[in-house]
Each structure stands twice: as structure tokens, then as C-alpha cells.
């Protein structure tokens, strides 16, 4: 048997924590006098770093911007972090775990934090829909592959 077959996958959540929070309502109180028909923009980003053998930090950054016309009603950003033990996998499987599986675990915590901040700002309730991090990760891989193909084509 090869050594790879003897290695079992290990996954454990060590800690989930809020790394950074920001809430701004730059046009308050004037924005409260307007009819609430906001345009809501959601931006997501993930980053991961290896802390030790098989131990990784994954940070999910969720930014929500609500605008009324040209004015920003509020801007809310949460960086939700997690420390995970991930062993027995490498390459694309590890990248998928850190880029999709772990952010999927972190998102409900970030969503709850954003909902709470928006509510404390006395804005109407904001319900963020679930995010398909697997699809986002697959799109990212496809863009990377297309980018490499274009770079190789230019070098030829």
C-alpha cells in the first residue's frame, strides 16, 4: 500500500472568531428620512494561511453596502475567522477545503454579525441569502485555468 492510502483525512474546527468589524452610516440621520428602497451590494473574499502543520487560519470577509441613489446608507464589513485542522489532503482538495468548505462554515457567523450590526444601526432587517461557496470556488478555478491558458498563449 502506498503512504497516501494510509493517510486519513482529518478535519476539526479549533476556533471560530470575529477578527474585525466595521459599521458606518455616513449619511445618517438624513438617510432615515428617505423611502427605504436600497440597492444592496454584497462582496465576499476569503484568505487562508498555514499556522502550523495541518493547522490553517481561514478568514471570510463579507462587505455589505446599502445605497439610496448616490448616497451610502450603510457600509458593514465583517471578517470572520476560523482556525481549522486539515490533514491528509493536499493540492486541489486542500484548496477546496480552505476556499469553499471552511468559508461555508464561517458564513452563518458573519451573517449573524452583519444582521446584528444593521439592526443596531436602526436600519430595516437585512437577510443575507446562503452563499454557494462551492460554485464560487469552481468559478475561481476556472478563471485561474483560463488565465494560465491565456498567459501560455501569449508566451508562444
UniProtKB/Swiss-Prot annotation:
Gene Ontology biological process: protein folding; protein tetramerization; protein transport
What's in the keyword line of the UniProt record? Chaperone, Cytoplasm, Protein transport, Translocation, Transport
- What cellular-component terms does GO give this entry? cytoplasm
What's the superkingdom here? Bacteria
Q: Tell me yes or no: is Chaperone among this UniProt entry's keywords.
A: yes
Subcellular localization, as worded in the UniProt entry? Cytoplasm
Pfam families in UniProt: SecB (PF02556)
Per its UniProt record, what InterPro entries does this chain match? SecB, SecB-like_sf
The answer, when asked if Transport is one of the entry's keywords, is yes
Q: GO molecular function: any one?
A: unfolded protein binding
NCBIfam families from the entry?
PRK05751.1-1, PRK05751.1-4, secB
The record's note on quaternary structure and interaction partners says: Homotetramer, a dimer of dimers. One homotetramer interacts with 1 SecA dimer.
Report the sequence similarity comment from the record.
Belongs to the SecB family.
Q: What does this protein do?
A: One of the proteins required for the normal export of preproteins out of the cell cytoplasm. It is a molecular chaperone that binds to a subset of precursor proteins, maintaining them in a translocation-competent state. It also specifically binds to its receptor SecA.
Q: What is this protein called?
A: Protein-export protein SecB
Provenance organism: Pectobacterium carotovorum subsp. carotovorum (strain PC1)
User: What lineage does the source organism belong to?
Assistant: Bacteria, Pseudomonadati, Pseudomonadota, Gammaproteobacteria, Enterobacterales
Amino acid at each position: 500500500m502506498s503512504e497516501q492510502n494510509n493517510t486519513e483525512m482529518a478535519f476539526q474546527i479549533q476556533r471560530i472568531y470575529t477578527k474585525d468589524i466595521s459599521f458606518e452610516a455616513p449619511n445618517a440621520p438624513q438617510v432615515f428620512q428617505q423611502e427605504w428602497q436600497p440597492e444592496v451590494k454584497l462582496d465576499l473574499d476569503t484568505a487562508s494561511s498555514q499556522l502550523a502543520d495541518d493547522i490553517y487560519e481561514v478568514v471570510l470577509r463579507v462587505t455589505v453596502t446599502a445605497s439610496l441613489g448616490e448616497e451610502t446608507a450603510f457600509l458593514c464589513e465583517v471578517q470572520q475567522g476560523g482556525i481549522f485542522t486539515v490533514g491528509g489532503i493536499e493540492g486541489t482538495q486542500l484548496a477546496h477545503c480552505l476556499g469553499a468548505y471552511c468559508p461555508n462554515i464561517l458564513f452563518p457567523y458573519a451573517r449573524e454579525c452583519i444582521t446584528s450590526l444593521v439592526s443596531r444601526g436602526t436600519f430595516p432587517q437585512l437577510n443575507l441569502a446562503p452563499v454557494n461557496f462551492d460554485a464560487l470556488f469552481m468559478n475561481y478555478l476556472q478563471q485561474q485555468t483560463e488565465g494560465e491558458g491565456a498567459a501560455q498563449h501569449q508566451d508562444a
